[in-house]
Amino acid sequence: MLFKDGLHGTSLHNYSFYCWLYIHIYPSLMSKNSIHKFCIAPMMQYTDMHDRYLLRLISKKVFLYTEMIATGSLIYGKCYEQLDFNREEHPVGVQLGGSDIKDLVECSKKCEQQGYDEINLNVGCPSDRVQKGKFGACLMLEPMLVSECLSNMQNAVKIPVSIKCRLGVDNHESYEFLHNFISTVKDSGTKIFVIHARNGILNGLSPRQNRNVPPLKYDYVYRLKDDFPELEIIINGGNQKFRRF
């Protein structure tokens, strides 16, 4: 899927780089009505309600996500308006950033009350600011905490709770590290995993560079699907051409 018109000072076709594409390896695990066949990733300063509404006009089937919303900002009212969305946007998920279980539970309830179809926990953003808040990609070093966060979020709401993460962080870039992380986190009951097929570099690269510099390792994600056939695995990163998958 390519978008050709401009928005927010950038070309919409650039969105294809960030799109999430479901891996069609085990079709028996995916119903005809799966809402994750094709998704637009959460993008700060881009995927607000106006952008999402435009994307919904372009496609009635794509799954949409909000920008990442930090739990602290939502709880203290600094960005509550970011929860607003047009009912025409469905299906649409909200992405939360945080690691405090109590805060995540409170925000999850707010999101469900607002009418979202899914809540996604950000464990993939490598920015310095996010690290200072102890959330994003740095949480891959604390799989037990991530699992506990997701478990409590799921117990607090009835809508699905998913996670977006990287292959690893810094020098933790082996498949074994990723496998162990997924193995621990899935015990929370989480079934939907969005995997950015790159390592996250916590120091030395900007968020923009982290979307391009670390090499793509799609084979890691394919191996995950083999090792965890019961999970819904969504691949992210460099998705410019469907035929690559």
Feature-to-residue mapping (PLM):
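Flavin-dependent oxidoreductase catalytic cores
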Residues: 26-245
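Short, low-complexity intrinsically disordered segments enriched in A/P/G/S/L with frequent Arg
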Residues: 5, 10-11
